[in-house]
Amino acid sequence: TTKLAHIITDKLIHIHPAQYVDYGIDFYDETLDICDTLYKNLKNITDKFPECRYFKNLGVNAHVSITPPLPFKFYIHQEGLEKIWSSVTYISPKENVGTKMYTAQNEDAFVKEAEWVPNSTFIFCGKQGKTWHSYESNQLTNRITFNLFIMKYRSKKCFYPL
């Protein structure tokens, strides 16, 4: 993650598995294994969330995300309607802002923050009008996460199935 932390950017960067080698990320096989396990356990996973959306054809989007340092903020938004399950694993730096949750699309509706703890994961199932959230960096370095989304299958968006 040292190389990723030092990339100079003012825009959000998503590094998909096919691009890992370009960024010196040695995690392709592990990403494939994780996606395979998620895919084989879709029913068990979605059964844990009673109001989970579902589509006939599902796939997994996987990427490493680089969020620029201060003053970048990703606006308050709800999860895309094509996503049924979302997972964000906090990687680097040691301290940062986690995922902020809201009851509406405004700062006054702030409820709680999923605390940033490296190597911990925040998981949720998006529900229209309910799962408002945002993220940002409060540091002078990039915020690095590993993201997985079970979603309606779209060949240009889904890494798995291959």
Task: Indicate where each model-derived feature is located.
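Catalytic core of Fe(II)/2-oxoglutarate
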Residues: F72, L81-K83, P93-L162
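Non-heme Fe(II) oxygenase catalytic core, chiefly the N-lobe of the double-stranded beta-helix
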Residues: D47-W85, G98
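Short, low-complexity Ser/Thr-rich regulatory SLiMs
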Residues: I66, T89-I91, Q139
